[in-house]
Amino acid sequence: MIVALQMCSGLYADANIEQLNLQLQQLPATRPLLVCLPESFLVFSKSGQQTLAIAKQSDVYIQQLSDLCRQYDIWLAAGTVPIATAHDKYFAASLLVNNQGDVVAQYNKMHLFDVDVADGTGAYRESNFTQAGNDIVVVDSPFGKIGLTVCYDLRFSGLFSALQRAGAEIILVPSAFTTVTGAAHWQPLLTARAIETQSYVIAAAQVGQHENGRATYGHSIIISPWGDVLSELANGIGFIGCQPDLNRLHAIRRDMPVQSHQRFREHLL
């Protein structure tokens, strides 16, 4: 089973870990269980400097996440954890941790949110403190082959196509969409990516008014390879879940083999 937690993370990592612990106590007893967390679940700061300070001690928090995985016998897709680089910046790293507490995959967010939005924040400049990643990540798991993305990556269909070609059956999209962009684009983009890649899309989201002054859209959602909404949580803290049917996924890919029909390649331009 896979579940997506919807969270309203705050300024302080310790408090956010405690919120996570409380939410984990409410989850079903089904095992194996993959728990997907939203972007910035560990710290949703007012400044890149505050996040950078957390990034420089990320090992401490990753150890706490590993301990939770062992305690609850779960796999954890840790939305984003800031991990310091050598350039006084940090990666927005999506980590996959198994039920033994081992980090089995790390994806560093590739596309950074340098955008102007008509909301209370106005200007977002993620690249001021975040270093972009370069590599796609697909990893085997008891739940299927998992492809990792983060939030703004959702707008770049080529990344999702690359994940599908690399074998992804389930694509995770931990996010902290603004209320403005979320209302306009969130579900249409997620549905399109699920249909295009014929994959399950699991999108755990931040929700509500945060201590840093930001407001996020929520609407955590799970979408099937056919584009059906399997579960959604519009507002509030909580969780949604599904049991992916990989036989159904492969039947869809067999009956409509769009990848084998694909003739367009960017390198031909």
Enumerate the language-model features and the residues they cover.
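Short, acidic/polar
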Residues: 15-25, 155-161
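Short polar catalytic/cofactor-binding loops
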Residues: 6-13
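Active-site catalytic loop in hydrolytic enzyme cores
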Residues: 86-166, 179-181, 188, 254-258
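Short beta-strand scaffold segments in enzyme catalytic cores
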Residues: 78, 93-96, 137-139, 220-222, ...
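A conserved C-terminal secondary-structure "cap"
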Residues: 249-269
